[in-house]
Regions:
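Active-site-proximal, glycine-rich beta->alpha crossover segments in alpha/beta enzymes
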Residues: 83-188
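N-terminal basic, low-complexity leaders that serve as flexible interaction/assembly modules and, when applicable
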Residues: 1-90, 132, 180
Length: 189
């Protein structure tokens, strides 16, 4: 059955649901950003991780430059970490943001979400940056291109607030503490 021309968003959605498409869908559910693309388009890290305009411009290049059917403006996995009390280093232009301080790493630390949660989460400047970049992309593409977001689950968030090594070791050494972490972080929007 022949399918007529589709918008990138229609193509992505059809491919995702197993429906016929007008051509194979070219998409990535993760970031496609690399140094060559940053040089070509202009925005670089760290600005593209901390400022919604450069973030959106760099994300848009997945479609505008490379022809992908989707764009995704969140380039790393640490955006939520700051909202959960981590100190994240966004300064290295050659690397993705990295948590430098994990509030639950100390074995005596109380495993609980930050004061004011969930409102404080949505007001965090890096969470807002990501949401603003998505809004900018929506204005730029309208309903033509699939705009993807990224949400980390409790396991990945635990790496940030707990410390990766300690968290993984505690899956055996202190599984109750791991469960408390996963339970607390399951409330993150």
């Amino acid at each position: 059955m022949a399918v007529g021309p589709m918008t990138p968003k229609e193509r992505f959605t059809a491919a995702l649901t197993g429906q016929p498409v007008d051509r194979p869908c070219a998409a990535s559910i993760t970031s496609v950003v690399n140094f060559e693309l940053m040089d070509l388009v202009g925005p670089h890290f760290p600005e593209a991780n901390t400022d919604p305009e450069p973030m959106a411009e760099l994300a848009a290049s997945a479609h505008d430059v490379m022809g992908f059917d989707s764009v995704m403006p969140i380039f790393g996995i640490a955006q939520e970490a700051t909202a959960l009390g981590c100190v994240v280093d966004f300064s290295d232009p050659g690397n993705l943001p990295t948590p430098q301080y994990a509030p639950w790493a100390d074995r005596e630390a109380e495993i609980r979400l930050p004061e004011g949660f969930p409102d404080s989460f949505l007001e965090d400047k890096y969470v807002k940056c990501s949401l603003d970049a998505i809004r900018i992309l929506k204005e730029h593409f309208g309903n033509e291109v699939m705009i993807l977001g990224k949400v980390m689950g409790p396991w990945t968030l635990s790496y940030h607030v707990y410390n990766v090594q300690e968290f993984l070791m505690d899956t055996l050494a202190d599984p109750d503490r791991v469960r408390r972490s996963l339970d607390a972080l399951s409330e993150v929007p």
